[in-house]
Amino acid sequence: MDYFYVDIETELGEMLTYYVAAMNEAHAEELATIAFENGEIECMGIQIVSIYAYRA
């Protein structure tokens, strides 16, 4: 497991950064998407427009 930052942009133009432990970039994006959908990431937007993971 490595640590990743995941940048998320919502339909309202909000830019959020989420920190997660994952196996690779795709896994980090998947975990961040799940956290977003479960309401663990607080924001006004309800839809992800773009998502990008990179190693911390």
Locate each region found by the language model:
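Short aromatic-glycine-(Arg/Gly/Cys) micro-motifs in beta-strand/loop hairpins
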Residues: 1-15
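Aromatic side chains
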Residues: 3-4, 18, 36, 54
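A short, exposed loop/beta-hairpin motif centered on an aromatic-Gly-Thr core
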Residues: 14-24
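Short, mixed-charge low-complexity intrinsically disordered segments
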Residues: 34-56
